[in-house]
Amino acid sequence: MAKQPASGKQIESFVHDDASRRNIPPAEYQTMLRNQEKTPLQVAYERRNPDLDPQLIWRGKDLLDESPLVVNAPPLYIQEKIHPKVLIDDLKRRAKAGATPEPLQTDLFASFNGLPSEEAKTEFYQHDQNWSNRMILGDSLQVMASLAEREGLRGKVQCIYFDPPYGIKFNSNFQWSTTSRDVKDGKPDQITREPEQVKAFRDTWRDGIHSYLEYLRDRLIAARDLLTDSGSIFLQIGDENVHRVRSLMDEVFGTENIVCEIVVQKTGGQSARFLSSVADICLWYSKSVDLLKYRQPYRDKTAGIGHGSGARYDQKDEADRHYRWTSLVSSRPPGSFPVDFHGKQWRPRAGYWKTGEEGFGRLTKAGRIGAGRSTLSYKRFLDDFPAYEISNLWTDVAGSPDKVYVVQTAPAVVQRCILMASDPGDLVLDPTCGSGTTAAVAEQWGRRWITIDTSRVALALARARIMGARYPYYLLADSAEGKQKEAELTRTIPSPDPVSQNIRQGFVYERVPHITLKSIANNTEIDTIWDKWQNSLEPLREQLNTALDKTWQEWEIPREAQANWPDAVRQVHANWWEARIARQKEIDASIAAKADSEYLYDKPYEDKGKVRVAGPFTVESLSPHRTMIVNDDDTLIDSHKQGATAEGATDFAQMILNTLRVAGVQQAHKQDRINFESLEGWPGNLLAGKGSYRDADGSLKTAGIFIGPEFGTVSRVDLVEAAR
């Protein structure tokens, strides 16, 4: 019998229905933008009060601090709308239909709209529309100012991951090609021709470490303005400048808002004259440490492995459970009462018992107390809490598989930072997008994201990475499947409330029990279970003592029966131990049921029958126009003011016109070649020449010659204006 082909997985994507974003213009609608909307707004950020805590000083800072930081906030323009799921669904539909023609799909970009009316499409910055994630080309300082001032995102970002240049040798590490990560500073054929990058590089390094610190502080000020009160910022830096950058962040965020300095082990050590550097530093600051959102990360304990985790659980009980003995003594009163245990009275040698008299009795009944030579100890099992809290030393996150970018961050580092400081549906920002690691991680874990970069190469790589990514489909807590799974985990009836697939309700996470001494000591059900089983155990103990002429207490009864015991006595002994083990199992079950649980936020349950692709996102830029050329002092080089005879510009345009006169224009097909009968210069702002040629039917046609920049690309708006 022929085997039936397996059906493909269902393809889904996460959507953020309760989130929205401001309606901004696509590039082709630039001419419909009102003049006041085209003009960049000026956003002023207050400088830090110099009378506060000590701060870092660099060349020119005193002059800068005399006035607020003023940033131009130009409008943003959408260059491209991308919805991977819609594209995949369309391909599947076409493949299924075969050669059958299909009607035009008019709602391809419906997920991007959500506007109240058709007229609202051209009323920019006045309405909200459906949320879509964003990649933005431009200076991160201006972009962040525009997001805050024009789009109302001030105080709306939950987490920022900032991986700036480390400021070591002040060389260019801009990747010049999407197909090669080989970057050699000073090599002519690897020099970037992107004006945004050239300007960013010059602005950052024009004065060495002094301009670098100015670059960082300005962006940290703008980033803080975007953070919500419970928000976090993570800044990754090398050990060469971590002391300077931490001083900067103290200045911007306040010394009281430092959360942690995280040491991140790298894949390999950087060679040095003395000790090799094997770690980077991730500085974690909060907007307000008292309001900080924090989700504790954990790692699994393994018996015999890991200092402070599983290594000390070196003993086993009869059920093969790993355990270790820990102290029962605390430095805090009260708790200095005597305790009778196994026929002997005990007191704490120094300090106080960790629990009261009633609690101590329950610990004893639960089998959690053991006697040493001079004190009592508490038996802690490995599975009481089979995980341990991750500290600020991260040795398990090194490496970035399949690098496509010269400075690509390890995804595990970004993932842990995002999971610690945000929830599904929260907004994550990355001012230095690079290859899109932050976007990829945020997309995987259901966060909204905005990434910014000055490099077209970086955004092209990030765009391709997100478009082609596949993610696990995690069970939403606000879904029928999620409610069913939650009910199974908690042994309760599923909630009858309706579901809406709201991602802000989170996922259904794996969890581990967290059994503590306190939870056992306060578990009154242990007393009830103990009393119930005593009615069975005590008569059996008395029978055993009578038959063997013993006075054994419960803890003195041997585990194995002796060979010379009569069969009847051996049966009583076996019955007693059977009841004793059953009592312990019931007590252990009660302890586990009443213990707290800790969620493993990096281990949500997955629906294996579904696969997920990225949700809708847009590619945007600061301006639809090409970037103008500036001098070393940032003054604009205006070719129109310099006249049409400007050296270089005229030579390049004349060279193109001469080539067109001789070679014409060769299009895709040989028969579509255009040969000009006449071609002359044209004194226009956009058109550089006017030519005439014969069409296929012999009629005379006129063509305007539009010549783009010698170094750079032609924008869509320039083409539209030239065509008009």
Regions of interest found by a model, annotated:
Residues 1-290, 373-724:
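S-adenosyl-L-methionine-dependent nucleic acid methyltransferase catalytic domains
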Residues 281, 287-393, 399-400, 415:
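Active-site-adjacent helix-turn-beta-strand microarchitecture at beta-sheet edges
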